[in-house]
Amino acid sequence: MKCGVRGSDTVEERAVPQGNVPGERYSPTQPFSVDMPSIGNQTLKESDMWGATAFDQLMCRIAFKGLRHEGVYTPPGLDPALQFPGSLGGMNWGSVSVDPTNSYMFVNDMRLGLANYMIPRDKIAAGASGIEMGVVPQTGTPFGAMRQRFLSAVGIPCQAPPFGTMSAIDLKTKKLMWQVPVGTVKDTGPMGIRMGLPIPIGMPTLGASLSTQSGLLFFAGTQDFYLRAFDSGNGNEIWKARLPVGSQSGPMTVSDPR
């Protein structure tokens, strides 16, 4: 990293859950960065289940109790399991941005779970495409897979918000400086209905951020249609502008050769 400091100095191998798929080989450990903050990959509990109403919260609690969830690195198996974060990514969709002057790193994350299980080859229905959610054929392997986003009956994540945040890490101290939810339900909502409300609950984020030497952090990868600027020192939103559609990529700058 070209800011005069290192990222994680210590990587530790830790024991992780083992799967139950016949013929599969599982690593007994996985690497963990032990001296850097952990962002958005907590082990979920039944009490973390949430809903827009008491009904869908109850349905999420019932669904959670029917899933095997052993925290990060929960492997798929023959029984339904919950991976959190899911395959859409945690803090790795849009990568990070770095302020090399102050040695700050900025990370946006996506907190969406994925429920899945493996299906023996002879039990996969003909015509499965693997497009979007549902059955993934995994042709040429002994098993296919069923995958579904861990959402409530009205189409919102089952765990309590925030569903996406922006975080700042001081690379000199390796401490979390600040973390704020990003994104509102203005352009989305239950059952795909736009709520039009600027409630900052923190939505799943896509794209990446852009940090500048002037102390600004730009970001547009939220579920509402805004380009935002944050104070990189404290995470306060200091400006935003409406976009015609949502953004799934990172902002960029240009330099005037004059």
Provide a role label for each language-model segment.
Residues 1-258:
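Noncatalytic, solvent-exposed loop/strand surfaces
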